[in-house]
A protein has these predicted regions:
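Conserved ABC ATPase "signature" region
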Residues: 16-34
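Conserved ABC ATPase signature
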Residues: 38-42, 46
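Catalytic Walker B motif of ABC-type/P-loop ATPase nucleotide-binding domains
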Residues: 63-66
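Helix N-cap at the start of a conserved alpha-helix in ABC-type nucleotide-binding domains
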Residues: 74-76
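H-loop/switch region of ABC-family ATPase nucleotide-binding domains
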Residues: 98-99
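A short, surface-exposed alpha-helical micro-motif characterized by mixed small hydrophobic
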Residues: 104-106
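H-loop (His-switch) and adjacent beta-strand-loop-beta switch element
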Residues: 111-123
Length: 143
């Protein structure tokens, strides 16, 4: 229910609808059955899934995810990618901070390459080039 405060309001109890949304999002990320566990009892990947469920429960139109694949196993990574694609198909805007270059073309359609300033932005096909990667990750060329 931590993702629902904007919908619940201050000093109000969550509605049955809020509880159902929270349960749906927990199930969507494959964490049903873990609802009664403390966050410190979960693995890093399980924590990432719970954080994603919390974000999804907000029912926002724009999501900013800071390295959602960090510290997760391959199974969790696949689940997160599937959820992101599903969100995209529902018209949601998703901005992801991501540093694993090998998976950029597999997971994303558009990219903004930044090194203190915008180096390049556009479709992965057009922008994710060796030249732009070098400009982005080379300390002397990105500035």
């Amino acid at each position: 229910l931590m993702g629902r405060p904007g919908h619940i309001g201050w000093c109000r109890a969550p509605s049955q609808g809020d509880r159902l949304i929270a349960e749906e999002m927990i199930a969507r990320v494959g964490m049903d059955g873990y609802e009664d566990r403390q966050i410190n009892e979960l693995s890093g990947g399980q924590q990432q899934r719970v954080f994603l469920a919390r974000a999804l429960a907000q029912e926002a139109s724009v999501y900013l995810l800071d390295e959602p694949f960090k510290g997760v196993d391959m199974q969790t990574e696949k689940i997160i990618v599937h959820i992101l694609k599903e969100m995209e198909s529902r018209g949601k805007t998703i901005l992801v901070v991501h540093h694993a270059l090998r998976t950029v073309p597999l997971y994303f359609d558009h990219v903004a390459m930044i090194n203190r300033r915008l180096i390049a932005a556009g479709s992965v096909r057009d922008v994710f080039t060796e030249e732009n990667i070098e400009k982005t990750f080379s300390p002397s060329k990105g500035v």
